[in-house]
């Protein structure tokens, strides 16, 4: 079974529409296919009919719950604030936006509006982008499913401090799964799955031609699963004019262009000083390099990665001569093909080590001696060469793997995105929402869970704000006493996505 993130349309229906007022927040509104825009929007019985009408009415602090059904999208130009964001959140398991909004050719367009959250909708078959945000800082897009949109699943431009998490973006017809552009700084792109997109899986392009400084600084890209992208070119993680990127705990496999590409094309400066740590990259046989740094993209630090290329001669790492300055790499598993002269040349690991790189790195064993099930399950075998062969000193503070397992489990960090857990064999088929349904109990004043589960329990209020997180790897409970009485959504996420969710009412401490 491929590691997949279950998108937000798997949310279980909240069982009630009860709401107690929370003074620090704005109004809660409702949209339903059986609603009417002449209604107040204050309950499901009085729901509005269209998302655009809701977008025209909301103010800072308001939340809009969206019932199951098919909708045209919305264009939002009203801003929220840090303490009072505007949230559009799917209430059921299938709130689908399958027609563009009335202003642009995107499903959702958020423009000149900050502190907006979009949560849990499915956006499909759009003429341009599934979800578009421009001139929109401090926004969140989470738990969405963006399929078969012409340009990209999620597109952003001039969006500082954006958070994109737990989204699935697939089958973009022309370009990328996720595309962050135009001088956007401090992006966090985590726990997404991007697959079968025509070009890149995740692209950040600073694009100085559109204004701004043409540099995107300090993004964090981690916990993502990216596969089967790039038939028309475009790296699985493609960075143009991006500086100070921190790229870790990602699984990239069977992509058809570069794994991680650092370059300058539209950006005003090269993609310098990237830290690339604890990733697993398995390139397809028709791919380019696992890691490529060109156009002066110097200073890359490459440690504790599995970098396996199935191409006939392209290999693990290639640097242009002008990207060599400040580069360092070690404790990687590589193929016997590397280059400091760009794409057209290759040398052996021994020759590469003579240049001062990868002194403690090793040539990869066959895939079936490293991974549980190459092609579908890239957990490490317990006796894989990657186990205990990494270095904590070069882990850049990363003390968990892609699934939240603590590093190290043995005497030293394992190489790659996954940390082996001794004799534990992870059965992808067994970890299903049914296990979580039977293993998690919502009581009057607490949420408890049994042994044998994995993941992170998160509680969200009606505004879509995450108000609590707890690891559930051992039996325990979370008391609700600190919550304000009201309606809440409990979810469990693993790096494979949303596994379980349930709405509940907390009536207060007894």
Question: At which residue positions do the language-model features occur?
Answer:
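Acidic Gly/Asp/Thr-rich repetitive segments characteristic of extracellular carbohydrate-active
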Residues: 33-67, 72-73, 352, 384, ...
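Beta-solenoid repeat scaffold
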Residues: 59-98, 111-119, 138, 352, ...
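Right-handed parallel beta-helix
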Residues: 85, 89-94, 114-125, 137-151, ...
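Residue-level detector of functionally pivotal "anchor" positions at catalytic/ligand-binding pockets or at interdomain
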Residues: 358-360, 419-446, 451, 506-510
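Glycine-rich beta-solenoid repeat tracts in large extracellular/virion proteins
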Residues: 73-80, 106-112, 129-135, 152-158, ...
